[in-house]
Amino acid sequence: ILVHAGVEADLPVNQQDRETYYYQRFYSQRPHHSGKTVVCGHTIQGDLPTNLGYAICLDTCAYGGGWLSALDLESGVIWQANEDGKSRRMSLGDLPIG
């Protein structure tokens, strides 16, 4: 499930409140009842994305001088770039779960 901020775990995607899509914080994300992985941003994670196993947050503070992060959903490869022109690549599997 690709979303800006998050989803309510107990509701189908088509029954979600827009406020949740836009403003929910990642630390309140629970596993979605569908079993699908939630991929979002909106809540800064520091230099690396966070993988909870059931949810992934890619917000690494690009607007505040941090890294811009992108995830290839098929391969699990994460690319990052910053304002200094540096880039790096890692696998979703390289991130600790939790």
Question: Which positions does each model-derived feature cover?
Answer:
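Acidic, His/Gly-enriched loop-helix segments that form or flank divalent-metal centers
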Residues: 1-67, 73-88, 93
